[in-house]
Amino acid sequence: MRRAAPAERREYGNAGEEAAVRFLEAQGWRVRDRNWTCRFGELDVVAERDDLVCFVEVRMRSTATWGDPSHSVSFAKQRRVVKAALRYLFAHDLRGRMFRFDVISVVGRGERATVDHIPGAFDAGM
């Protein structure tokens, strides 16, 4: 099996994030940021609805042959997302707001892609 070139993987990842954003917006979420980075890592999507800020990790695979993409969010990745999210809340003066960590899995591409949203997929461990 051929491994995709970095540019091809990035393009594929962008398509997955686009599908996730379309899904969230259809559910009434407002996307605040995409691919926000700090020294702790990257936040794929930051969205809000009402008083809730949602930090979304997006995972994508071309097929489900190797399982659901959401299963690839390791504990170490969760910790990096939590640290980046706390930094985001501080940097954007959102302290005191309710927040949650979701995972969106995208399998396939284009119109045939399936999107699965897992609200509260992990927590901050506080």
Swiss-Prot record:
Pfam families: UPF0102 (PF02021). It comes from the Bacteria. InterPro entries: Restrct_endonuc-II-like, tRNA_endonuc-like_dom_sf, UPF0102_YraN-like. Gene3D superfamilies: 3.40.1350.10. GO terms for molecular function: nucleic acid binding. Belongs to the UPF0102 family. This is UPF0102 protein MXAN_3551.
